[in-house]
């Protein structure tokens, strides 16, 4: 898998933005990706050094439209800790 297939989008929330100040970034990633693949993809895409990764599988929410019930897709979130003094400039402007 290439890093374009692994990294899907940054997580956009107040909690994620406050963590960016401490060098911790959150991304939605491919559910099939492993921690080592995620680490390599982030280091290759952004040119930073990753020192820790936590991952979690987030189940899709049930949604209802009228009398029909559906479910959103399950997703995987990766919380990435960067080396001291490093940041991802592409996401720094959003915080």
Swiss-Prot record:
Keywords: Ribonucleoprotein, Ribosomal protein, RNA-binding, rRNA-binding. SUPFAM superfamilies: Ribosomal proteins S24e, L23 and L15e. PROSITE patterns: RIBOSOMAL_L23. GO terms for biological process: translation. Pfam families: Ribosomal_L23. InterPro entries: Nucleotide-bd_a/b_plait_sf, Ribosomal_uL23-like, Ribosomal_uL23/eL15/eS24_sf, Ribosomal_uL23_CS. GO terms for cellular component: cytosolic large ribosomal subunit. One of its GO terms (molecular function) is rRNA binding. The keyword rRNA-binding applies. Belongs to the universal ribosomal protein uL23 family. One of the early assembly protein it binds 23S rRNA. One of the proteins that surrounds the polypeptide exit tunnel on the outside of the subunit. Forms the main docking site for trigger factor binding to the ribosome. Part of the 50S ribosomal subunit. Contacts protein L29 and trigger factor when it is bound to the ribosome. HAMAP family: Ribosomal_uL23_B (MF_01369_B). This is Large ribosomal subunit protein uL23. It comes from Deinococcus radiodurans (strain ATCC 13939 / DSM 20539 / JCM 16871 / CCUG 27074 / LMG 4051 / NBRC 15346 / NCIMB 9279 / VKM B-1422 / R1).
